[in-house]
């Protein structure tokens, strides 16, 4: 009985490993049709009796404002070009902060956020964190940095039912994602920690202050020229 159970578990694990690798490889080239977060939001809206229509239009890398690309990096993950999916010093600092009490601080890189939003459910269990680490490693192994950021920008939540840069640009500013200004990009990046609570088009004092900080960080990073550091040639 025990040996049979072990064989079945081993077989299931092998299928999971193989399936997840294939899925990540497919999404290296094919735009994901949706994300786990989008499904979760849709289900939540049904449960709450307030169904929502999801807004999302996939835009390729070249059709997204460079200002938004840099703004997201400046606000969310300034070591994006150099790390391999995990910012260990930031993780250690977050753990130390959380142990001292107070508000829980995260340290997720853009790659980790892609893994979580694309494949996983919300939560803080160690099991989910383990799956997040697995998918993060696969994404970093098989995708270029440009591809990671492209998928992130097309999957990020920017309001109730609003997903991706194009839908966000249209919803908040009435423009295409390719025409976002630096200020608009900074405001979109400023709400990413809590896009349902905060609005990019109607910024609170906090969001306005954070957007100003992000603009300064964008300048320190070198502006759009920073994107030249996203070395796609290091990928398989």
Swiss-Prot record:
GO terms for molecular function: pentosyltransferase activity; peptidoglycan glycosyltransferase activity. It is a single-pass membrane protein. The chain crosses the membrane at residues 12-31. Its EC number is 2.4.99.28. Pathway: Cell wall biogenesis; peptidoglycan biosynthesis. Keywords: Cell inner membrane, Cell membrane, Cell shape, Cell wall biogenesis/degradation, Glycosyltransferase, Membrane, Peptidoglycan synthesis, Transferase, Transmembrane, Transmembrane helix. Pfam families: Transgly (PF00912). It comes from the Bacteria. Belongs to the glycosyltransferase 51 family. This is Biosynthetic peptidoglycan transglycosylase. It comes from Pseudomonas putida (strain ATCC 47054 / DSM 6125 / CFBP 8728 / NCIMB 11950 / KT2440).
